[in-house]
């Protein structure tokens, strides 16, 4: 379900049971982004927006609340990313992680846990390859549902 001020780029897909709630503030989603089943994107009135770059995968049952997700990032299943957090380019938020408000997830790194903490750097090319593969696969899957 999509409400009010939401913009989704080319090749984007939102799967079953997702909610993009742009009634409080804007949500901008880049190209070839997939928001998987059960995820919620929400903002705070006059305080936070959501900005999602290109080639991003947002796993099942993720909550993103007023955060920035940069190009090529992967938000693992069941993660929570809170207001004013930034998930850097090619970064991974591991499944079940809680990225607290104002946390900066470094580009090309893995953060995990509750609260999410730095785990390790990943090879930038390997991360890009994995994250783009997932994003492009979901782009392909979405074509199966077009009439």
Regions found by a protein language model. Name each.
Residues 57:
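Short proline/glycine- and basic residue-enriched helix-capping loop/turn segments at helix->loop/beta transitions
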Residues 1-43:
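A positional/architectural concept
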Residues 23, 29-31, 37-40, 44, ...:
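Glycine-rich hexapeptide-repeat left-handed beta-helix
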């Amino acid at each position: 379900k999509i409400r009010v001020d939401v913009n989704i780029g080319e090749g984007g897909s939102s799967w079953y049971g997702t909610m993009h709630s742009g009634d409080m503030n804007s949500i901008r989603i880049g190209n070839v982004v997939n928001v998987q089943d059960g995820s919620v994107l929400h903002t705070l009135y006059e305080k936070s927006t959501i900005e999602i770059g290109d080639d991003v995968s947002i796993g099942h049952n993720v909550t993103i609340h007023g955060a920035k997700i940069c190009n090529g990032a992967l938000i693992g299943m069941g993660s929570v990313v809170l207001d004013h957090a930034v998930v850097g380019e090619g970064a991974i938020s591991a499944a079940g992680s809680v990225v607290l408000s104002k946390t900066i997830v470094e580009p090309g790194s893995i953060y995990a846990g509750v609260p999410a903490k730095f785990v390790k750097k990943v090879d930038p090319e390997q991360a890009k390859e994995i994250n783009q593969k997932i994003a492009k696969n979901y782009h392909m899957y979405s074509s199966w549902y077009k009439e």
